[in-house]
Amino acid sequence: MTYYIQISTIDWPKDQVLFEDTLNTLEKLCDTQNGYILNEPVSKFGWTFIDMILKADLHMSMEQEFAEQIKKSKGSKPEEKFTNFLVKYLENNNCKIKLKLMQSN
C-alpha cells in the first residue's frame, strides 16, 4: 500500500536531517531503497508542510519488521496504527514532527 503523508514542522532544516536519517535507517533495516519521496516544502504561519509518498515496498517491509509495535500503536484502523507508529518511531529518534495521513491506496 502506498501512503500519502503530510509532514508538519516548525523547524524543517533541523528536522529534515533527523527525518531523512531515520527513514534511511528504516530502509536499511527493511532492506529497501528509494522507499519514499519528499515534495518541495511549503511554509505558512511559521509551519513548514511537506508532502511525502511512502512507497509500498518500504511500507510493507516496515509492516513485517515492526508488526508487534504497529499492532500496539494507537488507532482503530491499520492506517492510523501505522502512522502513529511512525510518529513515535521518529520521536524516539529526536525528530519532533507531525504526520497526517492524507491518502492510502
PLM region spans:
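Short, extreme N-terminal segment that most often corresponds to the first beta-strand
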Residues: 1-24
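Short, intrinsically disordered low-complexity segments
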Residues: 31-76
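Short secondary-structure junctions
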Residues: 28-36, 90-96
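A general secondary-structure signal for short beta-strands and their flanking turns/coil
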Residues: 1-4, 45-49, 92-94
